[in-house]
Amino acid sequence: MRLSRYFLPILRENPKEAEIVSHRLMLRAGMIRQEAAGIYAWLPLGFRVLQKVEQIVREEMDRAGAIELLMPTLQLADLWRETGRYDAYGPEMLRIKDRHERELLYGPTNEDMITEIFRAYVRSYRDLPKILYHIQWKFRDEQRPRFGVMRGREFLMKDAYSFDLDEEGARLSYNKMFVAYLRIYKRMGLTAIPMRAETGPIGGDLSHEFIILADTGESAVFCNKDVLDLPIPDEHTDYDGDLSPIIKQWTSLYAATEDVHDAARFESETPPEKRIERRGIEVGQVFYFGEKYSKPMRSLITGPDGSEKPFQGGSYGVGVSRLVGAIIEASHDEAGIIWPEAVAPFTVGLANLKVGDAATDAACAEIYERLEALGVDVLYDDTDDRPGGKFAKLDLIGLPYQIIVGPKGLAEGKIEMKTRATGARENLSIAAVIERFTT
């Protein structure tokens, strides 16, 4: 993509309303624009990152055997009344009426609707287990939206729901999603710690939040530092096999959010030198809630013995749009964002330091075309901005690699390649640069 043809509204000054790094950098880098309190338009650069994050989530859900569908944003109020959640959910729920005075709501979550869909079609244990998921925009009317996409009112979520005949099967589904989440965050360059947590309005008696340690986190968290070094399951993990050793490894060390923190247990189980007491950002949560929705909605399954009983359920959420902010909180410096390659909007930023110079233009065109042919996403700065402005812009938007082409270097047969994460610079030939992206 040529920058001269792209839409990238960079801000030179720090926005006054931005309280945390991710909000400030997303606004400055032209990723988002606030349209109302807690509601953002995703501009082209930000939307590319959002799509990359969404795709990783989708790939790992599919790998774990989950099946994608799409549910609407608007839901009938009567559906929520079946489970008693319509009145219990509180003012965060946006309640509306259509022209026929039918009561609707803008979905903050989808347990009720997915249960209604499931009960309409599934009757027999032979159709179990199932895990269904969708990626959809949600709305929760936060009293005080803040921190940009980290705590907005409208946000993109991946919600998965499991359906099993009994508790044993439901816990197997829970384990699948637990492992899938470990892989999701690792692929995005994040160290996410599963921590015991409250179930909140979702309900149930088993839940883990996946937490990224950050000073800007919304809650206090407590854990054994050894959890930071545990191995992540690889892409060859057998989701139909026994995952319990992985779960045991990740849950045997102390890790809890402040809502369920047991100070006495923390001190007895964790040596002083291994205790971490920090703030944390929640980027996902898994729940086992049993019959909480299937029982009141009479979503019954006929078992092998011919008897009917409610299915055992679980739900599993990933904050897709929130993850974009969380990645920035975890990966930035004074100059700007440092994107992990897997979620970067472009892999390479190509800077032409003297647009109009025949040799420089030709070298940039060759690099651009050859990298594009290899499937490398390139943002080519072919504008007439001064070199310092181009360098600052590339550092701000955080692309993993910068290729800098100018007349002086070309005269020596060299161009400069900079790795954003380390700041390392190399002088290479065009052929050597291209070679870096072919292996």
Curated annotation (Swiss-Prot):
The keyword Nucleotide-binding applies. One of its GO terms (molecular function) is proline-tRNA ligase activity. The keyword Magnesium does not apply. Its main location: cytoplasm. The lineage of its organism: Bacteria, Pseudomonadati, Pseudomonadota, Alphaproteobacteria, Hyphomicrobiales. One of its GO terms (biological process) is prolyl-tRNA aminoacylation. It catalyses: tRNA(Pro) + L-proline + ATP = L-prolyl-tRNA(Pro) + AMP + diphosphate. SUPFAM superfamilies: Class II aaRS ABD-related, Class II aaRS and biotin synthetases. It is found in: Cytoplasm. The gene is proS. Its EC number is 6.1.1.15. Catalyzes the attachment of proline to tRNA(Pro) in a two-step reaction: proline is first activated by ATP to form Pro-AMP and then transferred to the acceptor end of tRNA(Pro). One of its GO terms (cellular component) is cytosol. Keywords: Aminoacyl-tRNA synthetase, ATP-binding, Cytoplasm, Ligase, Nucleotide-binding, Protein biosynthesis. Homodimer. It comes from Beijerinckia indica subsp. indica (strain ATCC 9039 / DSM 1715 / NCIMB 8712). Belongs to the class-II aminoacyl-tRNA synthetase family. ProS type 2 subfamily. Pfam families: HGTP_anticodon, tRNA-synt_2b. This is Proline--tRNA ligase.
